[in-house]
């Protein structure tokens, strides 16, 4: 309430626990000093106490409707009516009370609330029943006693073919549909949720001969995550990692290694506010130019920015196809807003994602050269362990087989070979 009371417009409403009106700003330790100082100035200028009641008085004066209710009294009443003495002490029920009071205020049909509780506590029937009883009582309390609120939220018919999804899930599902089968990562906000989601769905049934399993490994740091991603790609496996700004900064040396060795990988960068640790749980789009110029020296890469969640599912497929076709690292730009937002959209259509592995070889003849000069600058790519497909990788400039060289003419030819694919990409 201290943080958000002034965001409610005239005609809006605030439902609050009447038992907390006397709580002071000093009692809320999550209020940082700069915010508290600004709040105190606001309260002092309006001659209000430094309490919940003080900020609520300001809200009321600008036309906000206040709806006080004692959450403790609701639990006590329910405890007596259901003859369940445990209920009066279950303050965790405050969440259900708050949601139910809100839905009762806007007159939203209660069926969806009851069905949601059933779904969440499907395996805990007793807990589900307690929550449903609490929800019903709280909803009816608000519907009967909260007055003068003009906003209502009538029920709507559920549309067929729709999907409720969070941003990181859209990208993760895009990776599954695109044939990504290996994702090492190091935990970082807000990127970790994608890998955790992939890990929780590691084993999927085979549909239309397209296996759906993705191996997810938590590494010791971002450098290792990038190295393992590259290693996975060298085996011919579609491989990706995900991170945020500080983690991506650590990955840039290995990004250059992938660039000089023409390794197709996808890095999903869930941007947040920097620099350094910056604001780790807040939205930002700070890394675009950094991603474009990431890594020492010049080498081709693709930076692909998604505009919204639904788009990101299909964009992920494009990222993998571009990586394989042009044999370059692809940096898929997302952000905290996309990662955390929840939307309803049309159900994704995985069949719209095609898989193009580019010049990935199934068989290799004698005399294979991994970095062979070709007309389009893109060389046929073998996998680790293929018969006759031996090649060398180093971080140095190399000849067509991968052996280190410092020959100036060969250096120019190799640079031209790599950079020429930018014309194909564009």
Task: Kindly give the residue locations of the regions a language model identified.
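Flexible, low-complexity linker and terminal segments
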Residues: 165, 178, 315, 320-426
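Active-site cofactor/cluster-binding pocket
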Residues: 1-178, 182-184
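Short acidic, glycine/serine/threonine-rich loops at helix termini
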Residues: 5-7, 25-30, 78-81, 116, ...
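Short, glycine-/Ser/Thr-/acidic-enriched flexible segments
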Residues: 1, 20-21, 72, 188-190, ...
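Conserved thiamine diphosphate
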Residues: 59-69, 282-331, 355-363, 418
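Conserved anion/nucleotide-ligand pocket segment
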Residues: 87-95, 99, 106, 310-313, ...
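Short beta-strand segments
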Residues: 15-17, 67-70, 243, 266-270, ...
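Thiamine diphosphate
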Residues: 112-296, 300-301, 306
